[in-house]
C-alpha cells in the first residue's frame, strides 16, 4: 500500500521482555539500520494495532505471546518521508534462545545494557517509561536529515532531553 509523502504510516513496536531482559532486533535495513529496536512493522489493511502486534511478533520471531499489552504511542514527524504513528505494546515471554530473523539479528539485552547498546533516541524513553510502568504519548520531531529537534511526552506536557 502506498502512502502519500508526508502522511503518517501506522505501525506497531513490540517490546518483548523476560524479567529485566529485552529481546531486541539489530536491524539489517533502514530505518535504524544497525541499531537495536523492538520488533514491529506496519499495520495491514483492516488490522487492529493489537492484531498487528501479534502478527509482527510471530512473523519476525516465530514466538506467540499469550498477551500483548498496549503501553503507549510514539508519533514521529519530519519534513521527509519519515512520518509514523506507532502503537507500542509489551509482551512478557519465556527466555528462549534468540530465533533466526530475516529482518536482522535478535539478541537478549539486559536492562543494564540498554543505555549502551545503539538504539534510536526515542527508544531510551520507551524503555524508561515501560520499566516505570507509566503510559506515554511521545511526540518526536526531526529535521530533513532525521536529526531529532524536539521530543515531548504529551500526557504530562514534558519536554524530554535530547541526548544522542
Where are these regions (language model features)?
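Short connector loops/turns at beta-strand edges and beta->alpha or beta->beta junctions
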Residues: 28-31
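Unchanged
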Residues: 43-66, 76-130, 152-164
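Conserved N-terminal beta-strand and adjoining loop/helix that marks the start
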Residues: 1-23
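Short, active-site-adjacent segments that bind or coordinate small-molecule cofactors and metal centers
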Residues: 130-151
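A positional/architectural concept
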Residues: 33-35
